[in-house]
């Protein structure tokens, strides 16, 4: 049992963080979700997609407007935010490992800093989910670039 805890403490810590985010957005700060949901509109239409995609940051806006429409159910909205923040934490950890961070406890805790700062910033109702989506996309592209850069250079 102790060996299992030693091997799985990182995913458990990330899961605990995700549960805390869901509980926060579902119970005490449910009004923040409802506020953002009522002021955003999403149309599942090719014209609306093309109208959004031509603007800078349009893809992030389009994806976030799709996700925000589920905020009318606070648990689902909190889960969406938790998954995005957990993804940012995991991608930050992946980037940190690529740059030589040790796999110890303090090093892993540092990977939570971007997600926690973003969680605090999301308390401002004027910060839209498109910022979170764009940041997670940028981090993911950085991780993919670092992961496959040497392989692509050797092929080309």
Predicted region positions:
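Start-transfer (signal-anchor) and selected internal transmembrane alpha helices
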Residues: 1-21
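Aromatic-anchored segments of alpha-helical transmembrane domains
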Residues: 20-25, 111-122, 156
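Membrane-interface coil-to-helix junctions
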Residues: 24-84
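Transmembrane-helix motifs of polytopic, lipid-linked glycan transferases
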Residues: 82-100, 115-116, 139-144
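Transmembrane-helix signature of polytopic, membrane-embedded enzymes
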Residues: 96-117, 152-155
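Membrane-interface helix caps and helix-loop-helix hairpins in membrane proteins
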Residues: 120-130
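Transmembrane helices and adjacent periplasmic/lumenal helix-loop junctions
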Residues: 129, 147-156
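Specific aromatic-rich, kink-prone transmembrane helix
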Residues: 133-149
């Amino acid at each position: 049992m102790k060996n299992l805890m030693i091997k799985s403490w990182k995913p458990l810590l990330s899961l605990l963080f995700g549960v805390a985010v869901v509980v926060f957005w579902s119970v005490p700060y449910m009004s923040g979700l409802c506020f953002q949901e009522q002021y955003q509109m999403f149309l599942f239409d090719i014209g609306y997609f093309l109208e959004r995609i031509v603007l800078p940051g349009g893809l992030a806006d389009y994806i976030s407007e799709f996700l925000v429409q589920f905020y009318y159910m606070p648990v689902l909205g909190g889960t969406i935010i938790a998954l995005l923040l957990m993804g940012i934490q995991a991608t930050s950890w992946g980037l940190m490992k690529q740059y030589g961070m040790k796999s110890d406890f303090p090093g892993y805790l540092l990977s939570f800093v971007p997600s926690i700062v973003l969680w605090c910033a999301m308390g401002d109702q004027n910060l839209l989910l498109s910022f979170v989506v764009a940041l997670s996309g940028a981090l993911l592209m950085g991780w993919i670039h670092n992961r496959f850069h040497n392989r692509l250079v050797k092929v080309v």
